């Protein structure tokens, strides 16, 4: 079945109470560990060290989104500052961080979110670390890009993700500040057909086209996909145009297509893995299941294996 068409049924399944109890219970935890480094920063750093041994860099993501009170956003800022402090004392690891703006208070106000992001960016600037902004559902795109553009006026080391499943993303690319750092992703949220493409072919074609456009216009591009055809297409485009590899990076998710991660790293390409950690891992995990049928099959088959 087509990936975008399958996403809805899978996400509805993960909303069922019995499914959540299964995943978060004793049987599910060993499988969750494949996709989430753990609930603590130490777990994420341990995963980063293992990846470093494979010539793979790391982007840390302290899981959480749509906080329900401003003080929870402040707590999230504290978690990121602690992560950045940890990066300071791990100088041999190539670590960056990624944040969701709804975790930093975007649902409450633009001003609160910007103030919280300023604290994170100031801590990151002290150690020269890049901070990436995750893109959330289509309802947040305008607000997310507004925050990004405002912060970009004062900070160089901040970037944002764009989703090729959304019909609007080509226009958003046209309005980016010069020399932006962009993570290009397919997108994992369930979206209505009026705002998102309905077929995998459309999403993949847009991914390839926008990756080429971003690179041709001088942006730094983090190509975030596990699709070998799109990865190979990027390599061909970069080499044909003689684009320096300092402007390109391949990014993948922790626990997914580790064979591909290792192959690219061993071939000398820059690879960075998105390492999530924290207690709020369930929404993240369910999106991973929905975006790739293979992930759902892996989870189900391993539940059976661990349950024996």
Where are the model-predicted features located?
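Positively charged, amphipathic and often flexible ligand-engagement surfaces
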Residues: 1-308
